[in-house]
Design a protein with these regions (language model features):
Chain B
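Ubiquitin-like/PB1-type beta-grasp interaction modules and other compact soluble beta-rich domains
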Residues: 1-78
């Protein structure tokens, strides 16, 4: 579908190329969510993050979420880019971009996509601290 | 039947491998698979939760497993 | 304040430089809203838009909105860039960017800022159609 | 006192100028100013609404106008 762009990549994500792809003369509002690797979790310094994905299923689940966004809101284009591999503090694990004729739909769909991605897409993040590594959310 | 189970994230560490092989009866369900795995790898029960995917789709406990299905253990996801 | 960047400019807005400014090692989520000039209003082709601002008051009102965002949500940086002058279809009249440790605050503050900007900041837009020009929202 | 009133957007077209001068009594309020302007430029009353700003702040109808205040007519805004 040329109104959807899903990418799972071990290379740096490029915000500008996402913006270039999402903009169109039909759209009036674009909402972009950019996740970044924070330097601390609950006050504890983070050294780096490792992202692992079950790649074919992750792409399939991201496509489902994009499809749901089109069903729920009058949006024009949906972009989801996610990184894999090792990311340093300040790097970008995820970019979501949504264009729509009106901003309500763009904001709501963008929010829905990142919230749902964090619940359903098989990607796992391991945080490296000075005293060891932890798979995020694995244990109660 | 013999099936291969893919493991990701913390499950890979619990299994000590990204792929384990199991012997299942022909009418085995996801429920049966989880029971067997938890017998063999008790640390699975310490996870906040985990799902099983069959052919890239989340499966329900009652779903039947077929030979050649691609089975994967999905510990709590944490992307984004 | 070095956590706030307000710009009113007759030059093209640059999304990448906004992203570069808003990103920081303390932030985990960034929400960016980009307004674009749509090629039609209620099905009628739009040729161009002219933006006029009461500049000192527009800047002062944008600063107030940024300040309110800091009071209402735990956000780290707020950026508001707005164009003046003549814009063609596809050009960008406004960019809002908000960074926060957690995405909830970034999304809610970004939405609040664009909604409030459209209600209070003294900037006016004139749409040029094939059969004439109209000041948007001027008349009931 | 003589005051200058800045006009923007559609108000500039109604006034035929971006600045008009008015003679007001010394204790004049925003309400008085709007009444005078609407007498002189009846098309102001056809606007969806309009505000008056004094020294870059939105003013209330009862606010008093002082000599040298920067007064501006703010028709419905439509930025963003």
């Amino acid at each position: 579908m040329n109104n959807t762009q899903i990418v799972l990549s071990s290379e740096s994500l490029n915000v500008q190329s996402c913006i270039d792809w999402i903009m169109s003369p039909e759209s009036g509002g674009i909402d972009v969510f950019i996740g970044t690797v924070r330097n601390a979790t609950k006050g504890k310094p983070v050294l780096k993050l490792d992202f692992e994905a079950y790649e074919p299923m992750a792409i399939s689940e991201m496509e489902k979420i994009a499809q749901q966004a089109f069903e729920k809101w009058p949006v024009q284009k949906v972009l989801i880019h996610h990184r894999t591999g090792t990311l340093q503090v300040g790097e970008v694990p995820v970019i979501i971009a949504v264009s729509a004729a009106h901003r309500d739909a763009a904001f709501e769909a963008c929010r829905y996509i990142i919230d749902t991605l964090k619940q359903t897409v098989p990607i796992w993040k391991k945080e490296a601290f000075e005293d060891g590594e932890v798979w995020v959310a694995a244990h109660p | 039947m013999k099936i291969n189970v893919l493991a990701f994230g913390v499950a890979k560490e619990i299994f000590g491998s990204s792929l384990v092989s199991l012997e299942l009866t022909n009418d085995a369900t996801i429920y049966n698979l989880k029971y067997l795995l938890e017998q063999q790898y008790p640390r699975l029960k310490q996870l906040a939760s985990y799902m099983v995917a069959v052919n890239n789709e989340y499966a329900l406990p009652g779903d039947t497993i077929h030979e050649r299905d691609e089975i994967a253990i999905i510990p709590p996801v944490s992307g984004g």
